Amino acid sequence: MAIGAKRLVVGAHYGLRDWLAQRLTAVILAAYALFFAIYVLIVLSTKGALGYDEWAGMFVPVWSKVLALIAILALLYHAWIGMRDVWMDYVRPTGIRLALLVVTILWLVFCALWSAQILWSV
């Protein structure tokens, strides 16, 4: 006599890739935050204030824009993994879960495009 629904048996490494990806994106975000904090401290110690010119000046070099874009993409991927897991774990109706996943993807893609547009307009 079987009790409950049959469950699909998955491999031992189920979820490992997502766990590693989330840790990697967290390391990228921490490294960028450290870089950003050091930049702010250097500007504050040399100029005494942090105005628009200093903020915009940080994103003038292409390497700075690329680093910021990598950090933004890492943040968005980190958010995707987390939100996908929340929707998959806590939203039971398949239709609602699918709708939430699609809305999340669309929102994150919009944020990525908007961030790139802002970065390259400086």
Residue spans of the language-model regions?
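Membrane-embedded alpha-helical bundles that constitute the cytochrome b-like, heme-associated redox core
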Residues: 1-122
